[in-house]
Amino acid sequence: MARKSLIQREKKRQKLEQKYHLIRRSSKKEISKVPSLSEKWKIHGKLQSSPRNSAPTRLHRRCFSTGRPRANYRDFGLSGHILREMVHACLLPGATRSSW
């Protein structure tokens, strides 16, 4: 199980990303539309002044049950070993057992 502080940090990043999503998207569109380089630098500076954790690349997918950030399956939202345990216990409909 992941530490609670790491899970809370990830939730904080998700909130920041949602808050600054429209601002980041609009400033990126402005950069592509503006012809002069000096104006592009100004808009880029505004984009750089936003918080680092508001960038979507800083987010991780985490397992719903354990909070593990690695080996996640998008279809289920679970990490590999939890997915395997749930499939073997017949808790996931439509998933078949495999020996791996």
Swiss-Prot record:
GO terms for molecular function: rRNA binding; structural constituent of ribosome. Keywords: Chloroplast, Plastid, Ribonucleoprotein, Ribosomal protein, RNA-binding, rRNA-binding. GO terms for cellular component: chloroplast; small ribosomal subunit. InterPro entries: Ribosomal_uS14, Ribosomal_uS14_bac/plastid, Ribosomal_uS14_CS. The keyword ATP-binding does not apply. It is found in: Plastid, Chloroplast. One of its GO terms (biological process) is translation. The keyword DNA-binding does not apply. Binds 16S rRNA, required for the assembly of 30S particles. Belongs to the universal ribosomal protein uS14 family. NCBIfam families: PRK08881.1. Part of the 30S ribosomal subunit. This is Small ribosomal subunit protein uS14c. It comes from Eucalyptus globulus subsp. globulus (Tasmanian blue gum). The lineage of its organism: Eukaryota, Viridiplantae, Streptophyta, Embryophyta, Tracheophyta.
